[in-house]
Amino acid sequence: MSDPFKSEAPKADAPKADAPKAEAFKTEAAASEVFALEGLDLAALVASRVCHDVISPVGAIVNGLEVLDENNQDEDMRAFALNLIRKSARQASARLQFCRLAFGAAGSAGAEVDTGDAETVARGVLDDERTKLIWDVPRRLMPKNRVKLLLNLVVLAGNTIPRGGVIQVRSEGDGFRVVAEGTNPRVPAGIRELLAGHPANGHIDGTLIQPFYTGLLARTAGLSVTVAVEPGGVSFNVASA
């Protein structure tokens, strides 16, 4: 199963094998220098991203129902359609639960979220036959924007290993570290700039909103994100700004 949240628009920059040091770019740019989106525009783009994530399994459910309507006497086709509907419904539910926590309000402005819930929704969309999720974050209540940041970084990490691999999530001091390891890991083009709030040509659309939103979460929480290319993988390191 491929990464359900992969954005296919930007091409990727593959890391050089002989690079002695990881390249890093931080998100602590001054607020006056950061690209600003109007509230309605931000909401519209995030909503577009959520719809993009959910439309595939919902469409598969519709296809399964059509197969049932057209082949209700064929037992093999009926079994195929029911299996497709069942699998797609579970997938749609998992993606909606993830999006609710990663993009939604999750309670009042000062709400805290159980990191155990974050692990559950992350496993629902990323832990499959191609990608293994190793979650090493102690279960506790965490400010919701930190949890949202963590979940969005897990998605970004998944996008760096399109062929699958291992994603490790662990706490480090006041922050956390998300590492993706797999075959030919790569950092999608422009992701550092989007995390920093500096989109190319001052343009953001539904395919680019997720990394931009991730950087916005980091700045709101008083954190910085460092993206580093390492031997065999890519890491996202979060610390106090």
Give residue ranges: language-model regions.
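Glycine-rich nucleotide-binding loop
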Residues: 230-237
